[in-house]
Structures are given as C-alpha cells and as structure tokens.
C-alpha cells in the first residue's frame, strides 16, 4: 500500500534582498513578493573558507502579504515558514520555463528595521 502522507515545508532564515512588491487581486487580497538570501559556509577545493549565497523567491498572500508590505524591509533578517510551489509555463517562443517559490505561512522579523 502507498503511504499518501507527505510533508511540503520549508523554514528559511536569511536577509531580505529587496523590499516587498505588493499588488492586490480584484477581490482585494494582497500578494507580496520579495527575495531572501541564505548563506552556506564551507571550504572550497583549495581548503579555504568559502561562502555560497542562495536566493529564494518568497510569495506572501492575504494577511501575510499585508504584513510583508507594511513591516518587511530590504536587508532585514527574517524567518519564513512556508511550502514550495513550482509553476511551469511555455514562453512565447515555446520554451518550457519553471519557477520555484516559497509560499509563506508565516514571516517573523528577527531584527526590526525602522
């Protein structure tokens, strides 16, 4: 028998790359997007300390979108708890494209910027 239980959960702690861009649906729901940088530290092939930055696309709907618009700022350290969502589409040229985003279930500022 196949186990149908699964988990799609992401927890990221990083710095906001750009202040959220917010738009609203026809029914007034906020949709905010921003980038979040996380860093991985490890030795490179030469044995020297190295840093790799990974950029994540964050999508916040409804009350989380409103919160992001009002309180989240570029450079701020935040914790984002959410789930992965991958969208796929064809470009005008017929090329298959995809984008993976983290849909936020919560956004917690870890340092408050004025």
Task: Tell me what each language-model feature is.
Residues 1-114:
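Single-stranded nucleic acid-binding surfaces, predominantly the OB-fold ssDNA-binding core
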